[in-house]
Amino acid sequence: MDWGIFSYVIIGLTSGIGAGFFGMGGGTIIVPVMLTLGYSFEHAIGISVMQMMFSSTFGSIINYKKKLLNISDGIYAGIGGLIGASFSGLILSVIDTKKLTILFLIITFYSFVKYAFNIKYSTNAAPPIKSQFYQRLILILTGIITGIFAISLGIGGGLLMVPILGYYLGYESKRVVPLGLFFVIFSSISGTISFQNHNVIDAQVLHTGIYIGVASILGVWLGIKLIQISSPKLHRMALLSVYGLSMLVTAYNLITS
């Protein structure tokens, strides 16, 4: 096997384990690593989004079999994701790379603080949206908003979807997380097409994304197995270490670029 392909397989396995073990978007691992390997921020995002197609599909199949996924909700959120992510190529082609990298760093830092201090979103006991029509509309709008920002930064949608759906629809996080993973299937496909249409990514990036994506499927499976045998304390320390390392590597690449 070519050493380049071998390294991509290792990256895919690692990001997949992160997704299965921590429930985090692969971008937290993939983007800093690809920046370190000399890829541009746009190409790193493109590779991260392509990887999401594979890991989110595999993860959603598992969630569906475990009856954790509401397909109806997922389709409406997915429609929004298709629409929102279609703008991601335009965003990456017009916004300065350094600004996007800083925003990625801020979001990673927020995630670190959230888990370090065990900050949890409260579910609205009396959600303002009761009508089924408006509930579906909220799902679509949430998908659009999340698709625009999350795919443009190569991150999962849970960080944005959990507080929005928790407030307006009263959804608990354990219901939103599988929904967010299913949403990523739609938004990542739309985002990849948008990246291609705006010449953000090329054939080499597509091939790299496929290698990493296929390897991430095995990584997700391994991550799920690992979480079953690890203690909560070890899981928490490992999660914070990954976020901390991601911030350090991203900040280093930002300063030296």
Predicted regions and their residues:
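Residue-level signal for conserved functional micro-sites within the alpha-helical transmembrane segments
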Residues: 19, 52-55, 59, 81, ...
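Alpha-helical transmembrane segments of polytopic integral membrane proteins
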Residues: 27, 31, 47-50, 54, ...
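Single transmembrane alpha-helix segments in multi-pass membrane proteins
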Residues: 14-28, 170
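Transmembrane helix boundary and interhelical junction motifs in multipass membrane proteins
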Residues: 22-30, 154-164
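Residue-level recognition of specific faces of alpha-helices
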Residues: 20, 33, 43-46, 164
